[in-house]
């Protein structure tokens, strides 16, 4: 991820129209991930988790939840929220790490790895490098989920409509109308115009995952509210399988 994108996500930004939006966003993602946890004993990695306000929902469904976040201020908030000695949300099943710590973890550490709304901010080379790490970290028969993949024909208008539907169903519709106007003049729109977002055809992701040693397929639904975006599920192939 470029320093510009990392600084954006680690700062004060206009992506969420208000606190209600942010809460609903993270609760929906946590509920969706919790349903994917393969067993109550599974160790789960959420890579690029952001503020993960409702990580406790995922942790309740798993043996352990590891939150991996590159943005230092966001990571500090996560540690204070879930791992601090005095934090009201302290949860012994949640661990917060940086990407460099993840890369030092032993082989076969996880039964589920989730990468949601991340790879559009990475180059294809960066994503390929990550897949190699994930392939090593996953246990035999475990699962990798890549969510919020933007197809080449994905439009900002589709994202806006999905957000408006979410807002209407959850009581922040008027705030969203104002928030979308603010977003037009925000750093996000400027960065998106300058740096772009990495987009993938379905077949391109399938090929990339296959080359990294996974048996992949498109998931029936995306994690979260935006079903115009894609999600993929993959399991590491055993050494004897081609």
List the model feature ranges, each with a label:
Residues 114:
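A conserved beta-strand element that flanks and buttresses the S-adenosyl-L-methionine
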Residues 47:
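Conserved beta-strand/loop positions that form the S-adenosyl-L-methionine
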Residues 123-124:
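Helix-capping/helix-break motifs at membrane-protein junctions
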Residues 43, 64, 109-111:
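Structural signature of beta-strand start/N-cap positions in the alpha/beta core
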Residues 1-37, 41, 51-104, 145-242:
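Class I (Rossmann-like) S-adenosyl-L-methionine-dependent methyltransferase catalytic domain
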Residues 117-118:
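Short catalytic micro-motifs in class I SAM-dependent methyltransferases
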Residues 128-140:
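A short glycine-rich, Lys/Arg-flanked "PGG" loop and its adjoining helix->strand segment in the class I
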